[in-house]
Amino acid sequence: MNGVIMMVIAIVVLGGGYLFYGRYLEKKWGIDPNAKTPAYELEDGVDYVPADTNIVFGHQFASIAGAGPINGPIQAAIFGWLPVLLWILIGGVFFGAVQDFASMYASVKNKGRTIGYIIEEYIGKLGKKLFLLFCWLFCILVVAAFADVVAGTFNGFVDDDAGTVSKVAANGAVATTSMLFIVEAVALGCILKYAKLNKWVNTAIAIVMLVAAVAFGLYFPMYLTRETWHILIFIYILIASVAPVTMLLQPRDYLNSYLLIFMIAAAIVGVFVANPSCNLKAFTSFNVDGSYMFPILFVTIACGAVSGFHSLVSSGTASKQIKSEKNMLPVSYGAMIMESMLAVIALIAVASFADGEAAAQGLTTQPQIFAGAIANFLEVIGLPHSLVFTLINLAVSAFALTSLDSVARVGRLSFQEFFIDDDTDMDHLPLYKKVATNKYFSTVITLVLAYLLAKVGYAEIWPLFGSANQLLSVLALIACAVFLKKTKRQGAMLWIPMVFMMAVTFTALGMTICKLGGQFMTTGLSLGNTLQLIFAVLLLILGVIVAIQGIKKLTEKKEAQADKVEETTILE
C-alpha cells in the first residue's frame, strides 16, 4: 500500500458517496427547491440571512474542519492504517455526512430551529431541556479549550530552561494573519452585501485578500503575550457571536474555507507527485497499551468520520442561511466529505514516516507531523521545505479561531432556547425569561463561564470531550430519525449509525466510569479525576434518558399525525 493508492480509493469512495448516496437521501427525504426557506421566512439580518451556496459552504466547512480531522487519524494510527482508513471512509459517507445532512434538513423543515427544538417537537420537552443544557455546557467547554489553544498558538514569546524570553516568529505570523482575516472579513462582508458583484468576482477578491493576509503575516509577525491574547480573543468572540452573520461570520469563514481548500489541494498534489510509501502496519492489535480499538478508534476519529459538533453547526447557524433547499446537500453532506478527505491525507502523512522518524525531525505534535509530511511531499517538485512547512502550520493553526465564534453563537442560542418552548408567547414572557433570552445576556454569561473555565483548568474534564462529542451525535441521530418517521419520510438509514454510535459512546463512558470508580474505591481520586467521574456519570444518564425517549417514539406501532410544520407533500 502507498499514498497514491490510498488517495485514489478515498477519492472514488468519497466522491461516489456524494454523487450516489447523497442524492439518494435527497430523493428519499424530499427536496423542494421552490419552498421558502427559514432564511427568507424569518430573515432578521442577524442569524437568519439568506446566502449563496459557496458562502454557506464556506461557513459550514470552516466551522467543522480544522485540527480535528488532522489530530484524530494521526492519534488513532496506533491501531494500523486499515481500520483508520475504513472508519474514515465508511464513517464519512454513511455516518457523518448523513448526520450533518439530516440535522440541516430537519432544521430547515422546522423554521431553522436547532436539534433541541426538533427533540421537543417530536420527542418531548424533557428531552429538549436536557439536550440544550448539555449543548450549552459542551459549548462552554469547547470555547474555553479552543480559546486557550488559540492564545497559545498566538503567543509571541517563549521561555527556555534558563528563563530567557525569546520571540516566536511563527506564532507571531499566525497571529497577524488571523487578525488580518478578521479585518478583511468585515471589508468582504460589506462587498458581498452592498456591491452585489458576480460570485466569481467575489471569489477572486477573497483569494487576493487571503494571499495578502498570509504574506503580510509572514513579514510582519505580531508579538503579544498569551495572557493578552486570552483577553483579546474573548472580546472578539463577544462581538462576533452577536454581530449579524453578514458582518463577520459569513465572510470570515468564506475566506478561511479557501485557505483550507488550498491546503487540501496542495496536499493531494504532493501525494500524487511524491507517492509516499506506507510505513504503518495494516493492523497492529485490538488492544494497544491498554487502549481498545473499540471504542477508542471511533471516539478519537470524530471529525473526519462523524462528529456530534457538526450537527450543532448544521442546525444552529448554517440552516438559517440556506437560500434554497437544493443547497443543503452540497453544504452539509459536501462539507463532511471534504473533511473526510482531509482526514485521509492526515493518515497518509503520518504513514509516510518510518518509526521514530517524525520525532527525530522534531515533529512532536499532530499538526507538525502533518505539516512536515506535506512539506516533504512538495519538496519533490522544488518547493522550499521550510516555506511549505510554515504555510501549512499557519493554515492549521488559524482554523482554531474560525470555530470559536460559531461555537459561542451556538452556545448562546442553546441558552436562549432552554427558556423558550414551542408554545411560548414571546410577547408575554416573565421578566427572568426576557433577561435569559436576551442575546447579549446569554452571550455574556456563556463567555464569562468559558473564560473562568479556561483560567482555572478545563483540562481536568477535557478527556471526556471525545465521548461528549459522540454523545451529541447519538442525540442528533435519534432526533432526526424520529423527525423523519413522524413526518412520513424514510429514515431507516439513520438507525444503524444511531445504534452503532450509541454502543460506542455508552461503552466509552462506561469504561471511564469503571476505571475511575475503581480507583475511587481503592486509592481515591484527585480533584480532576473526581470531576471526570461525575461528568461521565451525568453524560451517561443524559444519554440513556434521551435515548429511551427517542427509541420509544421510533418503535411506536401507531405513528402520530404528520409533522406540525407547514408541509404536507413529499417529493419523490
Report each predicted region and the residues it spans.
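Extracellular loop-to-transmembrane helix junctions
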Residues: 2-19, 76-107, 116, 175-185, ...
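Extracellular/periplasmic helix-exit of transmembrane alpha-helices
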Residues: 271-285, 337-373, 406
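Hydrophobic alpha-helical segments and their helix-loop junctions in multi-pass secondary transporters
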Residues: 189-194, 208-231, 239-241, 246, ...
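Loop-to-transmembrane helix boundary motifs in multi-pass membrane proteins
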Residues: 125-140, 334-341, 388, 417-455, ...
